[in-house]
């Protein structure tokens, strides 16, 4: 979010160009390919990170990068686009004309309106993270819900498949509820009723 805000404020600058390239690459690269490249570079060639299994913090670095790279790119692009649009609105120009500091204009007035669509995208992307975890868990040999679901499907254990899908649906429903509650904190005009 921070990179998107800065890129939106400094439209056309080096930071903006970097954020747009990052967003383009992040949305284009498949997490499976990224995970294989990270294993090849940091696990096999440089031998600085473990390639599979679970243990300490260092075992989580590559899977976290793989799962968060696309998520971060989408969020950065959405924030930047929203910030550029909001900063061109008339009320932002009027707020600046009143002599309010730039930082207050960005944080209090512009960011509040940018965050609503960003929170929506983040909520839907968290569901996508759950769905994509099966592939990442398989690549890094992590014993997680995603890999358990794949194993249950392959062994035709229907009760386990139904249970895992029910848990996943419940988690996604809770995430959507939290997104709706978060809306009321961002914009008090929105009510939960």
Residue ranges and their predicted role:
Residues 1-15, 44, 54-193:
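Alpha-helical transmembrane segments of integral membrane proteins
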Residues 31-55:
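Extracellular/periplasmic helix-loop junction at the C-terminal end of a transmembrane helix
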Residues 2-38:
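Cytoplasmic-entry segments and transmembrane alpha-helices of multi-pass inner-membrane transporters
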């Amino acid at each position: 979010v921070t990179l998107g805000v800065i890129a939106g404020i400094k439209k056309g600058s080096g930071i903006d160009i970097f954020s747009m390239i990052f967003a383009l690459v992040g949305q284009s690269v498949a997490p499976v390919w990224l995970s294989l490249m990270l294993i090849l570079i940091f696990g096999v060639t440089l031998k600085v990170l473990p390639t599979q299994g679970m243990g300490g913090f260092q075992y989580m670095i590559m899977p976290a990068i793989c799962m968060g790279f696309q998520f971060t790119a989408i969020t950065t692009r959405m924030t930047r686009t929203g910030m550029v649009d909001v900063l061109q609105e008339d009320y932002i120009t009027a707020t600046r004309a009143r002599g309010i500091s730039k930082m207050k204009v960005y944080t209090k007035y512009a960011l509040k309106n940018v965050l609503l669509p960003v929170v929506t995208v983040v909520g839907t992307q968290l569901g996508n993270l759950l769905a994509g975890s099966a592939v990442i868990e398989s690549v890094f040999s992590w014993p997680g819900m995603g890999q358990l679901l794949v194993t249950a499907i392959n062994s035709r254990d229907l009760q386990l498949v139904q249970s895992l899908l029910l848990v996943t649906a419940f988690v996604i429903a809770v995430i959507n509820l939290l997104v709706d509650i978060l809306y009321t904190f961002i914009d008090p005009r929105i009510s939960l009723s």
